Swiss-Prot record:
Natural source organism: Thermofilum pendens (strain DSM 2475 / Hrk 5)
One Pfam family here: DUF359
Family assignment from sequence similarity: Belongs to the GTP-dependent DPCK family.
Pathway: Cofactor biosynthesis; coenzyme A biosynthesis
Enzyme Commission number(s) from the entry: 2.7.1.237
Catalytic activities: 3'-dephospho-CoA + GTP = GDP + CoA + H(+)
HAMAP family the record matches: Dephospho_CoA_kinase_GTP_dep
Domain of life: Archaea
Residues annotated as binding GTP: D48, V49, V50, D66, E124
PANTHER family: GTP-DEPENDENT DEPHOSPHO-COA KINASE, UPF0218 PROTEIN TK1697
Single GO MF descriptor: GTP binding
Protein name: GTP-dependent dephospho-CoA kinase
Length: 175
């Protein structure tokens, strides 16, 4: 699926909780929010810097990374005993391969106590929408770094799931 100009416009708006601090402060604030909420503690992390920042504090259950960062950081130290998967995804798109992989993993594999890492060949940015669509409802959070540099922390609720679904249906052209 390719994103339309309208999708890019709508995705420029922020949703969920926003943290404008740099790591580690942003991570600490986000984790306090998660701990004090009723939405579970499962963390789905999208992006290399976010994944690295949370992982350095022993946090995270599901990681979606592409090996590229705007800050040119090398992301290593993801969970060594994690189940690792790979898919290809071009910039500005959501490939069928990544969509299906994330849907299957998020609906069946997450929550079994094992860490999961999805390595994306290409770009992972838009895959946060798929994560929101299939995250464990009322029991998880999708967290990613916004292109403006702040941390977006979104509880997996029916409201945010419907926002992601509407964006995908209305503003992504099926290939």
């Amino acid at each position: 699926m390719s994103s339309s100009p309208a999708a890019r416009r709508e995705l420029s708006y922020s949703w969920g909780y926003l943290f404008f601090d740099e790591p580690p402060l942003s991570v600490e604030k986000a984790w306090r929010l998660v701990q004090s909420s009723r939405f579970g503690k499962t963390l789905i992390l999208v992006g290399d810097v976010v994944s690295k920042s949370f992982r350095e504090r022993g946090l995270g259950d599901f990681f979606i990374v592409d090996g590229h960062t705007r800050r040119n950081l090398k992301v290593e130290d993801l969970p060594g005993k994690a189940e690792a998967f790979t898919c290809k995804n071009r910039p500005g798109e959501i490939s069928r391969e990544c969509y299906e992989l994330l849907r299957n993993l998020l609906t069946s594999a997450i929550g079994r106590g094992k860490k999961i890492v999805v390595y994306v060949e290409g770009e992972e940015d838009l895959l946060s929408l798929v994560a929101l669509l299939y995250c464990p409802l009322n029991d998880s959070w999708v967290i990613y770094g916004n292109f403006r540099g702040y941390l977006e922390v979104i509880p997996c609720t029916s409201f945010f799931r419907s926002v992601a679904e509407n964006l995908l249906v209305k503003h992504f052209e099926k290939d």
